[in-house]
Amino acid sequence: MGFFSEEFLSWLDQHADEIDKQSCQAGEQLIEKIAAEGAFRVGISESLGGSGVSDQDVIDILAELAQHSLTASFISWGQRTLIDNILHTDNSYFKETYLEKLLSGEYAGATALSNAVKYLSDLEELNVRILEENGQLYLKGRLPWVTNARRDQFLTIFVAGFPDDPSTSYVVAVPSDAENFSRSEDLEFVSLQGGNTAALTFNKVLLKEEWILSKDAHQFLAQNRPAFLGYQFGLAFGLAERSLSEVEKELGKRSVLTDEWKHQVEQLEAIRQELYRGLSDRSYFVTNPRELFQLRIDIVDVVAQSLLLELQAGGGRGYFSKSTSGFIRRWNEGAFLPIVSPSAVQLRHILATS
């Protein structure tokens, strides 16, 4: 028994290819439709407007979405990750002003922490700087790739640093109606086009004190990394599950693939159990991040092998442009997972050098 209503999943299946290939009205509606199902309230205490349960349930919901549309799952990951950061800041402003708006989908949550993840691993400089003029702080810079940044009413979270003090960086969240803050046209991708992905520019945006989630980005992000990375597994789990399900339907005619199918099913379940075991104690992956990084690398390989199996099981029919199998969409979606920040290559680099 899944979490989502049959009515919603039917709508999502009907629009999945359109959302994948186009910047469209269905894509604009997606966050609110997912929110209407109560998805973003899972894993949040009832006292804050949630429905309780755990991080595992959040991942299961993202996996269910990914079985139907990776775009839907990815923007939901961004939404839920931003919510998680708001829940773990000492700054009450965001809980009081934006939490319910994010839970209901009135506001979209654009998580733009990929630059920060690379920065904290000494792989990249911060894209947004904090400038001080006449006692005021301003944001100056550009985030080149941010998903779930709708045309209006979104909140974006990122890390900005002081150019003259590289050791100091802030985690900040800025609303889309901030003065001197602009959004580009949608970036053009081969897949996930309906995810409202754009570049965001800060042209001396006045940094208000209430927008600062933490003045110690290193510590804040390290504490919240298990959820940031852990929730991403939902995308991979769902895509692999759908692919392996499609393979299973063909095993009667393609029995030669049975052993390999069983192996991938076992690998998927082993990774899932290791992840859930680590997330059951929020501090475990904080102190053992290498284990989380390796699991993330491993799940990318499982998705790739599952998709290759699906191609072999389905044969040439999935390659026709008018095929209704959804395979080519899943194939393109699968190509996105190795490059989601932190990418598989970045994680390999961290493991090799630390």
Residue ranges and their predicted role:
Residues 316-354:
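Glycine-rich phosphate/cofactor-binding loops in nucleotide/flavin-utilizing enzymes
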